[in-house]
Amino acid sequence: TGRSRFLQVPFRLKCKDWLAGTKKGYHKDVYSEHYVPVEEVHDTIEERISEYRNQGKKPYFIQGGGHGNAGTQSYVDAYREIAAQEEELGMRFSHVFHATGTGSTQAGLVCGRELERQEQGERSGNRIVGISIAWPCPRGRDVVKESILDYYRMRRQQNPGQKLPEFCEEDLVFEDGYRLGGYGKSS
């Protein structure tokens, strides 16, 4: 149906059924694909999750674009890889540029850099620059900031005694000047 409001959005729900009592952790992957108009995606996902639960399954839903702490943690780990590569190459990158949409990539890179700085005892380092593919400022920047703060809240709950970096406004560089009218629009 083209680029109308009736654009069909595919999504895939995956459930793993673990067979209790086995040493190997046998599992069976179960997939279900549905195509719905974009405005029905949220409700359809909720309905399918409810159906799986009613069948005795235990679905785990990862938000689109990896938004949330699982996605943020992935990019905390990615930043550690960047730092390891800098060490291996004997150089420091002055900037890390990336596309930012749901906020998890940028939140993870910023948190990863701050955790690395804290561990290394330094305040210098590269700038993480998110180039917005979706939201204008301040909305997009606020989404990234909330993802950073939410990630630190989660870490504090998991490890109450762990010292974590404080969020610093200047560490969040969000550029929205390249959106050209918004996501999916041609120039």
Task: Describe the residue ranges of each PLM region.
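Catalytic phosphate/metal-binding cores of nucleic-acid and nucleotide-processing enzymes, i.e., regions
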Residues: 1, 5-6, 119
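Small/polar-residue-rich loop-to-helix segments that shape phosphate-bearing ligand pockets
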Residues: 4-89, 163, 170-185
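Active-site catalytic pocket residues across diverse enzymes, especially alpha/beta-hydrolases
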Residues: 86, 113-117
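Short helix-loop-beta connector
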Residues: 89-95
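Short Gly/Thr/Asp-enriched flexible loops that form oxyanion-binding sites at enzyme active sites
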Residues: 106-114
